[in-house]
């Protein structure tokens, strides 16, 4: 053994070829944490000291290659400021450079995921061989940063500026065919041939049949473009990238382009310094803090879900009650992920609608070449429409998705319970109605749970799993595991009106109503909140949700939280409802809707909308300060999120933030309500609440925040 470290081993194979093997002990994946980087340095020294080594094959002892840097170390590193970040990166560059500069050929044998720092290590090698099962990429942009271990410098010299920008800005892992086509890897082979193929390349390099030194030299020099070609390449890249990423919201793509341009005419070492300086600028932005926090929160949520696996019982057969758009969407989602599902309704027209929805979604998958026609047929065969309960004795879980009316749901749930086995779990897809209340209609409330999908089911990643007063842990666990199997992210919440997401969303709509009442133009509110980062403003959102749905939901919330959610005035949303303007459902709401050339509903300004709400505007019509609109909208939403933590509706800030991002489109680069409060400053946020407390209870700072401010505490760190 030439080197035996905690993360890397080096041992001789044959013919002067040694295996340089990454296998981080005590971890399921390889990653570049501090320990690995130190061991990397030691392993390089061991190779340098051994004169018998003529070439290296770089391998992994894990099912993945190297997943990247250790993201949990970023917070501490990035908090030190730009200079400290550059001071941290430059020694890492020296280690990577010393590996690249070894006077012998190196071939990376990429067996699985090689992402971020993992692929940057592959780029240091002279050749890259990729398994057919592997993927490679530089996805750091998703974290609000960009490649910092030399990836931007080496990839742009290897595959050209335009391709490199696309790889890094899109942040999508590349499959073998795409990586080979672009020139990022040199060969793709079957998994069982990987080591042999990599070893053969090393042999060819050692023998002189491959000019590995010339290939390496390309990465050490400036980009091979003259100044005019460079200018054209970067202008094109900037146009493409900045059209998709607003620098005010996502600064990393522009900083990446700036550093690439600064380093393009420089040799490797100077270009790496430009990369490090640009990386540091990105790393200290609040967006990077939020997006890295989001990644870590996602891991927290996944870990919480995984803990339910042991307590779940298998779901071999599911059923859904209600075959409308929602029922059809649920059936599609279950069937497409391999779970057979019965779809029941009371009439053939409803069943036809549900099957049509599933068929349409599957057809789109085939058209996008994400599914073969034969797979579509197999998936449709897993959905069995029926008008009776005859087959329900074989069902493990029933998902009720009938109309959002407590009396209707209670009747349907009680009837269902009589037609299933004693251990069958019944889940309600209610969006606002208390699970504990609905459970009173059942003989076995321990088997009853909430399973709230968001619309459209096939696109929205979140499922709220709601624990009622008597819901068993087995029911929770089974529902969580089914949601995961359906390709969703489940978050377990305790019962209350609106649960977590809708309980938080309705104060946001309430804040909108109050702003309009006070004289704000709803179009200004929409524009301000869109620029703030929301996918759409609140007026447009309630049109999309359905104004009737919003009004009915608001009634449930007002009953549950009368002190904060029962206004003493009629608002613009209710005025629209009374005027039978339901939003996109009937093409008139706050906006008017007409089909565009692609057949999608496009909004246009409708003067009638202003006439409808005019009698309910009591404030002076005026142009509001944009920040006042942001503060009033965000305080109501964030305060209710904190109250959900206070009331133990949701267990952690991580889960609360993830739910808001996945459930209602909270701007990801702001990290969620709790992260937003942290970045505002808890004490400063409480002061804002006090400033607007005269507007009502929804604006009063929760006691949790006052305590945190007094003790200088944050949600994160």
Swiss-Prot record:
Q: Name one GO biological process term.
A: fatty acid beta-oxidation
Q: Which InterPro entries match?
A: 3-OHacyl-CoA_DH_CS (IPR006180), 3-OHacyl-CoA_DH_NAD-bd (IPR006176), 3HC_DH_C (IPR006108), 6-PGluconate_DH-like_C_sf (IPR008927), ClpP/crotonase-like_dom_sf (IPR029045), Enoyl-CoA_hyd/isom_CS (IPR018376), Enoyl-CoA_hydra/iso (IPR001753), FA_oxidation_alpha_subunit (IPR050136)
**Under what name is this protein listed?**
Fatty acid oxidation complex subunit alpha
Q: Which residues of the sequence carry a binding annotation for NAD(+)?
A: 326, 345, 402-404, 409, 431, 455
Cellular component (GO) terms are: fatty acid beta-oxidation multienzyme complex
Question: Lyase as a keyword?
Answer: yes
Task: Return the SUPFAM superfamilies for the record.
Answer: 6-phosphogluconate dehydrogenase C-terminal domain-like, ClpP/crotonase, NAD(P)-binding Rossmann-fold domains
User: At which residues is there a site annotated Important for catalytic activity?
Assistant: 120, 140
Region Enoyl-CoA hydratase/isomerase: start-end pairs: 1-190
- EC number, as in UniProt: 4.2.1.17, 5.1.2.3, 5.3.3.8, 1.1.1.35
- NCBIfam families linked to this entry: FadB, PRK11730.1
Q: Which reaction does it catalyse?
A: a (3S)-3-hydroxyacyl-CoA + NAD(+) = a 3-oxoacyl-CoA + NADH + H(+); a (3S)-3-hydroxyacyl-CoA = a (2E)-enoyl-CoA + H2O; a 4-saturated-(3S)-3-hydroxyacyl-CoA = a (3E)-enoyl-CoA + H2O; (3S)-3-hydroxybutanoyl-CoA = (3R)-3-hydroxybutanoyl-CoA
According to its UniProt entry, the function of this protein is described as: Involved in the aerobic and anaerobic degradation of long-chain fatty acids via beta-oxidation cycle. Catalyzes the formation of 3-oxoacyl-CoA from enoyl-CoA via L-3-hydroxyacyl-CoA. It can also use D-3-hydroxyacyl-CoA and cis-3-enoyl-CoA as substrate.
- Pathway the protein acts in: Lipid metabolism; fatty acid beta-oxidation
- Entry keyword Repeat: no
What keyword terms does UniProt attach to this protein?
Fatty acid metabolism, Isomerase, Lipid degradation, Lipid metabolism, Lyase, Multifunctional enzyme, NAD, Oxidoreductase
Residues at which substrate binds: 298, 502
Q: Where is the active site?
A: 452 (for 3-hydroxyacyl-coa dehydrogenase activity)
């Amino acid at each position: 053994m030439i080197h035996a470290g905690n993360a890397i081993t080096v041992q001789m194979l044959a013919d002067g070829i040694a295996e340089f093997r990454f296998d981080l002990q005590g971890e399921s994946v390889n990653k570049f944490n501090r320990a690995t980087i130190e061991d990397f340095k030691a392993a390089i020294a061991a190779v340098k000291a051994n004169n018998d080594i003529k070439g290296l094959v770089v391998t992994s002892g894990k099912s993945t290659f190297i997943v990247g840097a250790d993201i949990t170390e970023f917070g501490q590193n990035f908090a030190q400021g730009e200079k400290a970040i550059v001071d941290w990166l430059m020694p890492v560059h020296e280690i990577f450079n010393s590996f690249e500069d070894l006077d012998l050929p190196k071939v990376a044998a990429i067996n699985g995921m090689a992402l971020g720092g993992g692929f940057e290590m592959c780029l240091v090698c002279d050749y890259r061989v990729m398994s057919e099962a592997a993927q490679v990429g530089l996805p750091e942009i998703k974290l609000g940063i960009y490649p910092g271990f030399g990836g931007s410098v080496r990839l742009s010299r290897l595959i050209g500026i335009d391709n490199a920008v696309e790889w890094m800005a899109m942040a999508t892992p590349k499959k073998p065919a795409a990586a080979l086509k672009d020139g990022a890897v040199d060969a793709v082979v079957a998994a069982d041939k990987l080591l042999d193929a990599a070893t053969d390349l090393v042999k060819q390099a050692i023998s002189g049949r491959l000019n590995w030194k010339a290939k390496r030299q390309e990465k050490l020099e400036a980009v091979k473009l003259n100044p005019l070609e460079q200018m054209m390449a970067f202008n094109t890249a900037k146009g493409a990238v900045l059209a998709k990423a607003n620098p005010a919201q996502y600064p990393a793509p522009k900083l990446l382009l700036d550093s690439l341009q600064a380093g393009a005419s420089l040799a490797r070492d100077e270009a790496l310094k430009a990369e490090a300086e640009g990386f540091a600028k990105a790393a200290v932005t609040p967006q990077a803090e939020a997006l890295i926090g989001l990644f870590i929160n996602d891991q927290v949520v996944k870990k919480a879900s995984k803990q339910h696996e042991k307590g779940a019982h298998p779901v071999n057969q599911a059923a859904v009650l209600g075959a409308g758009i929602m029922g059809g969407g649920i059936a599609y989602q279950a069937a497409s992920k391999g779970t057979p599902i019965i779809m029941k309704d009371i009439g053939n027209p409803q069943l036809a609608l549900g099957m049509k929805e599933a068929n349409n979604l599957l057809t789109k998958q085939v058209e996008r070449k994400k599914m073969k026609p034969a797979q579509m047929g197999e998936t449709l065969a897993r959905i069995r429409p029926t008008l009776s309960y005859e087959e329900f004795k074989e069902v493990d879980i029933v998902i009720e998705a009938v109309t959002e009316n407590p009396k209707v749901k209670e009747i349907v749930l009680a009837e269902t319970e009589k037609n299933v086995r004693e251990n069958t779990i019944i889940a309600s897809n209610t969006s606002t109605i208390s699970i504990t209340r609905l459970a009173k209609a059942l003989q076995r409330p321990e088997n009853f749970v909430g399973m709230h999908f968001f619309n459209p089911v096939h696109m929205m990643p979140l499922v709220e799993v709601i624990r009622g007063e008597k819901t068993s842990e087995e029911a929770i666990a089974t529902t969580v595991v089914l949601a995961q199997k359906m390709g969703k992210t489940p978050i377990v919440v305790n019962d209350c009106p609106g649960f977590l997401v809708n309980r938080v969303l309705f104060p946001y709509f309430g804040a909108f109503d109050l702003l309009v009442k006070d004289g704000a133009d709803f179009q200004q509110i929409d524009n301000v909140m869109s620029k703030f980062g929301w996918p759409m403003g609140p007026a447009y959102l309630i049109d999309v949700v359905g104004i009737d749905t919003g009004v009915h939901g608001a009634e449930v919330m007002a009953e549950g939280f009368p002190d904060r959610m029962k206004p003493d005035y009629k608002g613009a949303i209710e005025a629209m409802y009374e005027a039978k303007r339901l939003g996109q459902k009937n093409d008139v709401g706050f906006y008017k809707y007409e089909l565009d050339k692609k057949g999608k509903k496009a909004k246009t300004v409708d003067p009638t909308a202003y006439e409808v709400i005019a009698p309910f505007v009591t404030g002076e019509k005026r142009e509001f300060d944009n920040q006042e609109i942001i503060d009033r909208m965000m305080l109501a939403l964030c305060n209710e999120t904190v109250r959900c933590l206070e009331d133990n509706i949701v267990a952690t800030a991580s889960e609360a933030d993830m739910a808001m991002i996945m459930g209602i489109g909270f701007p990801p680069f702001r990290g969620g309500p709790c992260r937003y409060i942290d970045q505002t400053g808890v004490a400063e946020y409480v002061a804002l609440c006090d400033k607007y407390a005269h507007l009502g209870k929804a604006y009063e700072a929760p006691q949790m925040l006052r305590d945190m401010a007094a003790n200088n505490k944050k949600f994160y760190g």
